[in-house]
Amino acid sequence: MRGAGLRGIIWYVICTLFLLVGCSSVAQESAKEPPSFSERTQVVESPDLTFSRVDKLMEDMTLEEKIGQLLIVGMEGKTYGDELDHLIRQYHVGGIILLGKNISYPAGMLKLLNESKKANAAYKIPLFISVDEEGGRVSRLPSSMKKLPAAEFFGRTGDETLAYETGTYLADLLHAFGYNMNYAPVLDVHSNPKNPVIGDRSFSSDPDEVADLGMAVMKGMTDNGIISVVKHFPGHGDTHVDSHLSLPVIEKTIEELRETELIPFKRAIEENADVIMVAHIMFPELDHVFPSSLSTKIITDLLREEMHFEGVVITDDMTMGAIVNDYTVPEAAVQSFIAGSDLLLIAGDYENQVDTFNALMEAVQAGTITEERIDESVKRILRLKDRYMLNDDLIEEIDVTKIENKFNELLK
């Protein structure tokens, strides 16, 4: 893992903390403060130190700052503009996402990311800088750069070593631009050949193969400092409808889901996945009222309580047709948060982004959401940022030739 992070914060930990966790060697140094991000050189350290830093930071955060951290926002156009600047500087959003509509040439893409970081430089919490870089038809690279094949290619090889090396390559590629989070790999099982949205984005129709290859790609990224977001829980592989356009319905029982769709996600949880993205899909056998991304029965009862996931839950983009055909973005975001989500992904429309922030504030003021519930999610988010030592350091230039040499070596 690379970089400094959460700059400007002095983290205090009293001597008794070290005694309680039984770290006698640390106790001898108890007069010293725990290392800040910039001082740390090792990825692995006591979770108690991460928790202590986050707890200290949260003591000084306002409710507005906490709610800002719950949002990952997108933007219009290919250049940095006033709306994104306002969201970063005034609302202190947790992160940004770049989509295809934002991608230009390599230097332009780098400039956009650097300007986002500059806007956040005076703030104490670094941004998630996120992207969908799966390979195949879901790639956010400039058109001049070589792109990885779709997941289906790796499924045909069955080569877990190649899958891990692909995750490593993705980490190197994304670090080169300054990203720190990738919405990949896809853990959906390709169980419906007529699926209009997943298809070759899935590794296989075999859930165990999806799990094996997906975990290899995930670890290739996380071992090299990129946060991996596995998706689309509880499974998007058997849909007949594209959730970007309308709401898919899957008529499967929980027993049927356990036999296929949930297998890769169960493995991901066992392998300590950091973030799981929840899909916008209706599973009437599980919840006949809300789609999965808004469902307490699916996010809290199934994912959290039954499957014991303790990491960060993020929604799929809340501006997709599956949501906006039936809800406003703010009301859907509030319901998703009540259901158990931590991060709310709103990939576009400045008005919706600001209205969602205001709706969350109003929900707390009305008592619909407690501040304790806000703190729960913010702690998960900040611990993740802390663990990966995120930073807003600028990238001076991109060596495209070096990246392409790595690509050629990977797929030679």
Task: List each model region and its residues.
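Second-shell loop/turn segments in exported
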Residues: 39-44, 73-78, 95-104, 151-164, ...
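Active-site-proximal loop/short-helix segments
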Residues: 141-146, 180-200, 231-247, 279
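Catalytic domains of carbohydrate-active enzymes, especially glycoside hydrolases
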Residues: 86-99, 169-181
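Bacterial N-terminal signal peptides
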Residues: 12-22
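Hydrophobic faces of well-ordered beta-strands that scaffold small-molecule active sites
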Residues: 68-75, 94-98, 127-133, 181-185, ...
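A substrate-binding/cap region within the structured catalytic cores of diverse enzymes
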Residues: 151-179, 186-214, 218
